[in-house]
Amino acid sequence: MSISARNQLKGKVVGLKKGVVTAEVVLEIAGGNKITSIISLDSVEELGVKEGAELTAVVKSTDVMILA
């Protein structure tokens, strides 16, 4: 599949917390850094997200939030 987003981060799922409607996915990327995303449970099932899976996060620069 080809996409236009330039911010693609490959990593491994190191955390997965399922809620009622959404799930929190923690991806460990290069350098041991971690990024967290909230996605729907439907997406978790459709994408086959599970701990240890190798995934690519696609990040739109306009959708980044920084927490301090």
From Swiss-Prot:
SUPFAM superfamilies according to UniProt: MOP-like (SSF50331)
GO biological process entries: molybdate ion transport
Domain of life of the source: Bacteria
PROSITE patterns named among the record's database cross-references: MOP
Keywords, ordered alphabetically: Molybdenum
Residues covered by the Mop domain: 2-68
Signal peptide range in chain numbering: none
Pfam families in alphabetical order: TOBE
Keyword Transmembrane attributed: no
General function of this protein: Binds one mole of molybdenum per mole of protein and contains a pterin.
Name of the molecule in the record: Molybdenum-pterin-binding protein 2
The species this protein was found in: Clostridium pasteurianum
Taxonomy of the source species: Bacteria, Bacillati, Bacillota, Clostridia, Eubacteriales
